[in-house]
A protein has these predicted regions:
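Short, polar/charged alpha-helical segment
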Residues: 47-66
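Short, well-ordered beta-strand elements
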Residues: 33-47, 66-71
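Short helices/loops that flank or line small-molecule/ion binding pockets
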Residues: 54-59, 76-95, 108-109
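An extracytoplasmic/periplasmic, membrane-proximal ligand-sensing/linker region
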Residues: 187-230
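Short helix-initiation/N-cap motifs at beta->coil->alpha
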Residues: 65-85, 102
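C-terminal motif of bacterial Sec signal peptides marking the signal peptidase cleavage site
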Residues: 15-20
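Bacterial signal peptide processing site
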Residues: 21-25
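A bilobed periplasmic-binding-protein/Venus flytrap-type ligand-binding module shared by bacterial periplasmic
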Residues: 168-186, 206-207
Length: 230
């Protein structure tokens, strides 16, 4: 089993204020924000989600925005549904989710249909993580999003290990950022797509271990930013 450190535990271990532990209040960000100020939200149940949020945040900074990452405390109790709601209601601008979990929350009937289809097609050896299944679940998730919400390209890497108690179906769980559609232009979306296309499981595991070792997500991922020209 991989080591996981919750956001709260990491903040306590640091014993100092870090960017994700003590950001400006969410309401303040919404008050002072404009199109160039973006809030990236994530489920703070483990460091991997924080790492992903900071990667997407940095890509938006590079695209000319002032972006912040913000841990969504509601998602600790309410799961990824709280992240989706925060985008739909305009409390955040970008959220890090996963395709299967998002689809099951947004359109349970379609999620069940696809899960049964994959199981029937492959029986006990069904590969729900095949490229075909991944693309089909992503397309269904995009179709299920509210009309004011859009999605960047999914990563080939899966996440949302902590959604097991929230979702019941065997579906691909590819990492994907969703966002408020009117706020991001083509260039911004390409910036998100770059991160999705670049990140892989080995990278995430290494960054996760490094963040725990250094007790700092920002310090762990800074070399990755530079090496990958984010």
């Amino acid at each position: 089993m991989r080591r996981r450190l919750s956001l709260g535990a990491l903040c306590v271990a640091l014993s100092v204020c870090t960017a994700a532990c003590s950001q400006p209040a969410q309401g303040l960000l919404r008050d002072i924000g404009d199109r160039d100020t973006l809030l990236v939200t994530f489920n703070p149940v483990d460091t991997e989600n924080w790492i992903l949020a900071e990667l997407y945040q940095t890509s938006l900074d590079s695209a000319g925005h002032q972006a912040y990452s913000h841990d969504n405390n509601d998602s600790v109790r309410q799961g990824y549904a709280a992240l989706i709601r925060s985008i739909r209601e305009g409390d955040a601008d970008v959220a890090v989710v996963c395709t299967g979990t998002a689809l099951e929350l947004l359109d349970p009937a379609k999620a069940k249909e696809l899960s049964e289809k994959f199981a029937a097609k492959g029986g006990q050896t069904a590969d729900v993580n095949s490229g075909e299944a991944r693309d089909e679940v992503y397309a269904a998730m995009v179709a299920s999003l509210p009309e004011t919400v859009a999605a960047a390209n999914p990563s080939t890497t899966e996440g949302c290990e902590n959604s097991a108690g929230e979702t019941m179906l065997e579906l691909p769980q590819n990492i994907v950022p969703i966002f408020r559609k009117h706020l991001l232009d083509h260039h911004d979306r390409q910036s998100l797509n770059k991160v999705s296309g670049m990140i892989n499981r080995a990278d995430l595991d290494e960054l996760d271990d490094k963040a725990i070792e250094l007790q700092s997500v920002s310090s762990a991922i800074k070399p990755y930013f530079i090496d990958n020209d984010i």
